[in-house]
Amino acid sequence: MSKGNEEGQAIPPEGQDGERAQEKRLSRGKFIAAAGAAGAGLVAAGAPAAMAKSWSKGSRNKALTANQHAPGMIGGPTGFPGAARYQYPANSEEGRAVLAARALRKAGKAPDTLVVQALNFARPQFENKFPAGATASIAGIWERETGIKLKFVETNPASEYATNIRNASTKNGSFDLVTGAIEDTGDYAEAGLLRPLDDYVHKYRPSWNDPKYGYAGGKPTVQLFTQYNGRTYWVAFDNDTQPYVYRSDLFNNPREKAAFENKYGQPLTVPKTWDDQAKIAEFFNRPKASTPLYGSVERKCPFWGIVNWEHRFLCSADPNMFYFKPDGSANVNNTAGIRAAEEHLRSLGWSEPGALSKDWLAQYQLFGAGNGVQGGTFPNVTKLIQPANKTLDKGFGKYLKTDVQPGRMVNGKLVRRTVIFYIISYGVNAFAPKSHHEAAYLFLQWAGGARMYTYLTANPGGYQDPHHTISFNDPLVIQEYQPQPVRALKEIIPRSAPGITIRGAPQYNQALDQELQKMLTKQQSPEQAMKNTERRWNQITKRLGTERQAKAIRASYAAFPTKGRYGPNSPIK
């Protein structure tokens, strides 16, 4: 990042600082602010009062109906009410990217087409027009503004890792942009598949650390979402910070509240600690009721279940309990690891029949049918379980609220940690033609910029979730995810921690997963599960090179929440 300007800012116009100054300059008679969406139940929201005053009746109607950009904006979507919210000036992360890509194309230094590897459920958000009236999709806007086409090649979560490890070994340069999860970062970087992006980040200054346009949670979130071993490899296109979901109608029922307090001697409220969570799970677990209730429906199945051990483990120290010690050795065969395993096992008793083989979709079905009381899951739970989606919502989606995962009291402080699980990311394929690299990065900065990415995540066509601060005030995002869960995300992201992202992450995760599954199927005790995990993790580290792994482990600590990020101490309203 350049010195003398805030990170993510261009050279300040008229002696002012960055993108916020640019907005102020344009708003004085030139900038047409974000319009509230009309039509399908949307209301005006999120536009600063000073900008709203700049509307005249004529200019407002013109901007809302014409297929053109608002004054001062050089690009972005058009054709629908509120499109100006996602348009951008030249002095913005999107503006810098699109102007640079256009210049590269004109100079013959960019390809005719960028080939983008994308997950099957992410691709539609790039290619589907949204909302009604939009003149182009995300891909169409990019081509219109730069002259560079996009070609998508699909993969899926089940095969993406193996495919890309094979791409690395064969040095496959037939595609320009790599997709993956942050758990894959270490392996992809060490295999040479991902090109480090720091030179482009320095040159084009994305606004990731900007207080207004940046990632919610600031610098630790940026490091968590984009970096490995101190270098930038990804641009984040997702937010799989796991919220804690609960049935608000049950928690607010006067009869249930009175019965709970009578039994446990404390009020029924959203659990702040894992001890609270266990009491609530026990209380509401009613498998033989006319509508069966299961008290704790976070996942226990292979792959999807390990995150629920991680939530419990990480909150055992202030500010975090780490998976590995600074010397690279495993840090799980201890009180924190064993307790997390014991709680994970105990929770199985409050789960639905067959829980050991049921994934997140089965969990969504439980919530939608009114059978699930509480449990951690993905942010799009309230986006998908809505009345319009009769496949999932059987009348209970309206009661689903979210909060930060429960935690523990540590030295008088309430430590609550949510773990990022998966998160779709994109990087530049190091084996693609070098002449494609810069344009490939510029597409990521543009599509992953605060304005354009907010627009992308509001599109109901896919599962890429919001993580920029401004996204949480956007009417279309709020409409899709629901108001309370969007407010909760603002609190969840700053308290989010990574899973294992160093080289060999899939091997470490598989070892933990297998030992937890043996425990859940009563083949071994929680103590033995952690002892075996420690042994296997240390073997993996030794095989990959202890000194090298330890260096990456120490660097990874910067991606965890910092000291002082406690609570919240009351439910998020």
What are these regions (language model features)?
Residues 154-164, 272-276, 355-369:
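Short helix-initiation/N-cap motifs at beta->coil->alpha
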Residues 276-283, 320-357, 401-408:
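Glycine-centered hinge/linker elements that transmit conformational signals in sensory
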Residues 167-168, 173-176, 206-251, 411-419, ...:
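A structural signal for short loop-to-beta-strand junctions that line the ligand-binding cleft
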Residues 45, 223-238, 242, 272-330, ...:
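Extracytoplasmic/periplasmic solute-binding protein
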Residues 69, 74-90, 95, 99-101, ...:
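C-terminal lobe and pocket-closing loops
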Residues 55, 65, 72-73, 117-118, ...:
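C-terminal capping/gating helix-and-loop segments adjacent to ligand/active sites or protein-protein/ligand interfaces
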Residues 3-5, 14-26, 31-193, 204-212, ...:
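Conserved N-terminal structural module of periplasmic/extracytoplasmic solute-binding proteins
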Residues 134, 138, 339-343, 434-447, ...:
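Short amphipathic alpha-helical coupling segments at ligand-binding clamshell hinges
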